[in-house]
Amino acid sequence: MHDIRLLRDQLDVLREGMRRRGKLTELGDVLDRAESLEQARRTAITELEAQQARRNKVTQEVAQRRKAGEDATALIAEGRAIGEQITALEQRRNEADAAVQAMLYELPNIPLADVPEGDETANTVVRTWGTPRTPDASIVPHWDKGEALGMLDLARGAKISGSGFIVYRNRGARLVRALMNMMLDIHTEEHGYEETWVPLVVNRASMTGTGNFPKFEEDAYAITEDELFLIPTAEVPVTNLYRDEILDAEELPKRFCAFSACFRREAGAAGKDTRGLLRVHEFDKVELVRYANPETSLEELELLTSQAETILKRLELPYRVLLLAAGDTGFSSAKTYDLEVFAPGVGKWLEVSSCSLFTDFQARRANIRYRPAAGEKPRFVHTLNGSALAFSRIIASLLEHHQQPDGSVRIPEALQPYFGRAVLA
């Protein structure tokens, strides 16, 4: 959520941010209505202050007349009328306040200055690592290879839960566990993250705090009677760990990692490639979350991204890092890097991580603050997160990129101690 002072004093900054995202046409009316409501709020406050001053004066005059033994009936009636006007003005002010706050929830974050303008076609490759394997007919797509190896059971996953749900069996289940342990060990032992194990269901306040609600409520799986929601990512519960709390500056940066299942209805995914593990409703992921001092948050983003890249290097998967254009940057993010691996069996680059800086956008919604020094006024932290990494597409890439001429699949050296073997055959 934005600082309401932007709306009051720097509306042009908000308009420019929405323009860079390609959202000005869509959200221009929201800004116009918010500006109108803010003007109405200011008018109500001005009138309210005038009426409060008048009431105070009338109250004093009533006291003086009574003290002098004079009739104050007319003044008392006037005071009551003023009180009714004050009540009405307070209601107008409160209604305008609530409406403006609701509209602020509809506005995405403002992209940082170095984020390129445009849609996804303007995403910029900032670096690459490794050499992607050239697709050829001998490389079996991961869905066929996984089923042939007895690792994936797509049909029974669909029978149990519907399309987009996967059953991992035998070595497939072991591979998921191996990936989890390897990633968590690297992030906790090498990168200094605190491991957390968080609930898979959260309340509305948590989803609102990270920016998932109200904008993307249709994408969430809901437990309606309890008003709880399955998490789309561990970002939601981990970011909300310190909701409505004040940290000391010395505690920053705070670093958390968490493994979790993730649930997404993908309501807007019709027509996209959903074969195999490419687009599913439930998947596993290790998430990194940071609370940072605003002065160092850009450096924190670069560090977090490099830590996600470490996993891809250990898995020996060639990848590229994209700086997302403003129109492709997520709702809450001010700057995002996507990590993509190449899957030669399907001939596509697959996103396996998004590493984002949210500035104080989430912190304002969740009221997460820090105190710069003793006695100073609390300020909002900057939040960051990144997938490190999402398992389903990683498994797809492993099965395709490390596929051998004899049909076996080589297990990367760093993963072998966790998986217990060097080859899948």
Swiss-Prot record:
Chain sites annotated for binding L-serine: 233-235, 287, 387
GO cellular component: cytoplasm
GO terms, molecular function: ATP binding; serine-tRNA ligase activity
Record keywords: Aminoacyl-tRNA synthetase, ATP-binding, Cytoplasm, Ligase, Nucleotide-binding, Protein biosynthesis
Residues annotated to bind ATP: 264-266, 280, 351-354
Lineage: superkingdom: Bacteria
Stretches that traverse the bilayer: none
GO BP, one annotated term: selenocysteine biosynthetic process
Record's subcellular location: Cytoplasm
Oligomer status and interactors: Homodimer. The tRNA molecule binds across the dimer.
Domain-related comment: Consists of two distinct domains, a catalytic core and a N-terminal extension that is involved in tRNA binding.
Function: Catalyzes the attachment of serine to tRNA(Ser). Is also able to aminoacylate tRNA(Sec) with serine, to form the misacylated tRNA L-seryl-tRNA(Sec), which will be further converted into selenocysteinyl-tRNA(Sec).
Family according to the record: Belongs to the class-II aminoacyl-tRNA synthetase family. Type-1 seryl-tRNA synthetase subfamily.
Protein name from the UniProt record: Serine--tRNA ligase
